[in-house]
């Protein structure tokens, strides 16, 4: 085994897949999760369960690892900062703090001349009425919320849901005429040192990623712009590791940055089978200071997210040589819960 032991905060499927990639590189992992039933415990030799602010567990975690990363962005900044004072946390905690808030994230993008949909900070119901130029639009909590949680469609300023809790801050984003969604995954190893995956075309159902494919059916102009913006973002953040930028394309072929995920990303699961180096392996290589390997696409690919009961048929299915199924080994099947993914690879024409 390597002399490096990687600490991973978070025990979901991304933690599992990071641990699998680390093992491939002979790197031990220690997964720290606040859920004792986290599926990632099945993919590591060392699993710590408890509250992230538990001093005893933090001390145990730090004693076992050389470097720390995380599989989701909603970890309190103060915890990442505290860990980083003793062992390096990558990506840097300050990046996570910036991106945890949708308003500061959008401001960062706009300050770097990266187009987003029009938006405004919303603190109360009157702010929505004042910003009626953003209606119809989508109201999102500034912090927390993923896969459509904490979001409300606003079609008229008179029709504001009573479910909206105005003790929280929100961001109101104007709807565009959406044609397509894509994502770009990039791994930054240091100043101007990158591995970039080609844009991935995505389809969402109920605001949860359902389907991804490469190559994306997009123009060369959009492809280059999306890749350039992802590079600017990674460089401006002084990022280390794998990052994903999600984009919208409207019916006039305008590109908009939707959000930044400071971690490996669901749409990149297909890279496990389509490329010589997956997004997970590249992340491990970057945060652990390993050699950068030129990343090449070997196959075109399609990936299906298995949500809820979708998993049942796949657990008993026989697969062809070009089909790959990954079961996240979650004990409970729930509606809208990501249970696994299925990838088909195809040779380029």
PLM region spans:
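Peripheral (often C-terminal) accessory segments that flank ATP-dependent C-N-forming ligase machineries
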Residues: 2, 285-349
């Amino acid at each position: 085994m390597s002399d490096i032991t990687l600490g991973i905060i978070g025990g979901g499927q991304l933690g599992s897949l990071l641990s699998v990639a680390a093992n491939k590189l002979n790197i031990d992992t220690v997964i720290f999760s606040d859920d004792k039933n986290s599926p990632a415990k099945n993919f590591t030799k060392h699993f710590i369960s408890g509250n992230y602010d538990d001093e005893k567990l933090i001390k145990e975690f730090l004693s076992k690892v050389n470097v720390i990363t995380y599989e989701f962005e909603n970890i309190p900044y103060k915890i990442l900062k505290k860990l980083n004072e003793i062992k390096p946390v990558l990506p840097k905690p300050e990046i996570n703090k910036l991106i945890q808030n949708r308003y500061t994230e959008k401001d960062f993008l706009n300050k770097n001349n990266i187009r987003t949909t029009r938006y405004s900070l919303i603190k109360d119901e009157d702010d929505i009425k004042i910003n009626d130029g953003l209606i119809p639009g989508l109201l999102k909590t500034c912090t927390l919320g993923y896969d459509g949680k904490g979001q409300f469609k606003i079609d008229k300023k008179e029709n504001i849901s009573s479910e909206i809790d105005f003790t929280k801050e929100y961001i109101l984003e104007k709807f565009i005429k959406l044609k397509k969604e894509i994502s770009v995954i990039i791994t930054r190893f240091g100043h101007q040192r990158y591995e970039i995956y080609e844009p991935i075309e995505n389809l969402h159902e109920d605001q949860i990623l359902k389907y991804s494919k490469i190559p994306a059916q997009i123009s060369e102009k959009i492809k280059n712009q999306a890749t350039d913006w992802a590079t600017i973002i990674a460089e401006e953040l002084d990022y280390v590791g794998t990052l994903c930028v999600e984009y919208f394309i409207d019916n006039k072929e305008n590109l908009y940055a939707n959000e930044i995920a400071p971690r490996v990303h669901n749409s990149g699961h297909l890279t496990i089978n389509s490329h010589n180096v997956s997004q997970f392996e590249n992340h491990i290589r970057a945060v652990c200071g390993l050699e950068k390997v030129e990343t090449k696409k070997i196959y075109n690919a399609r990936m299906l997210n298995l949500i809820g009961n979708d998993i049942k048929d796949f657990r008993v299915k026989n697969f062809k040589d070009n089909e790959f199924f990954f079961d996240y080994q979650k004990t409970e099947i729930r509606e809208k819960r990501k249970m696994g993914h299925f990838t088909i690879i195809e040779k380029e024409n």
